[in-house]
Amino acid sequence: MGQTLFDKVWKKHVLHGKEGEPQLLYIDLHLIHEVTSPQAFEGLRIQNRKLRRPDLTFATLDHNVPTIDIFNIKDEIANKQITTLQQNAKDFGVHIFDMGSDEQGIVHMVGPETGLTQPGKTIVCGDSHTATHGAFGAIAFGIGTSEVEHVFATQTLWQTKPKNLKININGSLPAGVYAKDIILYLINQYGVDFGTGYALEFTGETIKNLSMEARMTICNMAIEAGAKYGLMQPDETTFNYVKGRPYATDFDSSMAWWKELYSDDDAYFDKVIELDVTNLEPQVTWGTNPEMGVSFSNPFPEIKNANDQRAYDYMGLHPGQKAEDIKLGYVFLGSCTNARLSDLIEASHIIKGQQVHPNITAIVVPGSRTVKKEAEALGLDKLFKDAGFEWREPGCSMCLGMNPDQVPEGVHCASTSNRNFEGRQGKGARTHLVSPVMAAAAAINGKFIDVRKVVV
């Protein structure tokens, strides 16, 4: 019997252990940030241990970084975490993409942009959206602080191999419908736990026709489906993206291995989901987890349980309403899900020559300094600012209430991020997950509209 893509990468990295039992995996790349690394570094100090592979460990600052004045950090805890990582990187010989450096940004942007993220690697980070890197054909997953310390000390992790789930996606995406809509629809249809215990492999003609940035959007939200891993077969689109990037120095010698990274025709999948996106609509979440969403033309559903009732109460909405009925106050274009150059370009087409609605506060936060520079070279910063958007410095920003960028209590926000939990964007904030184009259109119109009518 053949092997899946996941099987091939997993098998190559097993150092010890039998199938069906926890196995010791070698870790090729460890990405770290300021929030989940301090205790792990301190653990090394207490045990008088060195960092096993500082050359495979890379740090960036993202979660706590202010996006207005990056060098004026007013929050004491945020400042402490940032300065602690800077000192730890110095003490342990870790390369850091520091504040103001050309490569600094959200960790899941920095890895791909620098060429650190490559097909066939095992990649870990103390962040739940690490599956983003799986878009390259890597096994990438989030880990906790104790596991961060374990990788620091040994460059290995004990893991139990998951089952394989294939999500076969075909059809041409309609105008105004994007990768974000695909993953939101899947979660809405199958729930926030359908991927639990599985590695999700996204396949099909639709996936093959997506850019690398769109592929990353889908893998980014695998965790919102309950899956630790989400990945895609690397192909010419992948190779062309990686080629020439600073840390992709072994590109030519790696190609033979990379071209073997596909699921064999007779590979066994424990479960298969089929999706035709030909008639897919823009998606909007109405509740307090990503499963609580609807296609744009559909009304919000009836209350089925106590969770639905709590979500409606928190969001100030009720069954039967539609997305266009939501009174928006904020729009956030950013996060590791949708703050790449293509996201900003797509959004810019909607707002060109328009003005942000007077009831809306709209901010754009490029996911990295690389994206910011490239966008500014195209004049996107001027376009957004002329329309009334705030143009910020890179960081996680309003994706989570861990920095100064927060949505006021009771206010509805159209957000291109990945989570709409209670309080995720600030105490009492009401988050609606959408694509960048949906968010941009909402900023101009003061409400959600069907972008299929305005995107050509």
From Swiss-Prot:
Record EC number: 4.2.1.33
A molecular-function term among this protein's GO annotations: 4 iron, 4 sulfur cluster binding
Cofactor: [4Fe-4S] cluster
Catalysed reactions, as listed in the record: (2R,3S)-3-isopropylmalate = (2S)-2-isopropylmalate
Pathway: Amino-acid biosynthesis; L-leucine biosynthesis; L-leucine from 3-methyl-2-oxobutanoate: step 2/4
InterPro entries per UniProt: 3-IsopropMal_deHydase_lsu, Acnase/IPM_dHydase_lsu_aba_1/3, Acoase/IPM_deHydtase_lsu_aba, Aconitase_4Fe-4S_BS, Aconitase_4Fe-4S_dom, IPM_dehydratase_rel_enz, IPMI_cat
Cofactor note: Binds 1 [4Fe-4S] cluster per subunit.
PROSITE patterns recorded: ACONITASE_1 (PS00450), ACONITASE_2 (PS01244)
Superkingdom of this protein's organism: Bacteria
Sequence positions that bind [4Fe-4S] cluster: C336, C396, C399
Membership in a protein family: Belongs to the aconitase/IPM isomerase family. LeuC type 1 subfamily.
Functional description taken from the UniProt entry: Catalyzes the isomerization between 2-isopropylmalate and 3-isopropylmalate, via the formation of 2-isopropylmaleate.
Protein name: 3-isopropylmalate dehydratase large subunit
Organism: Staphylococcus epidermidis (strain ATCC 12228 / FDA PCI 1200)
Organism ancestry: Bacteria, Bacillati, Bacillota, Bacilli, Bacillales
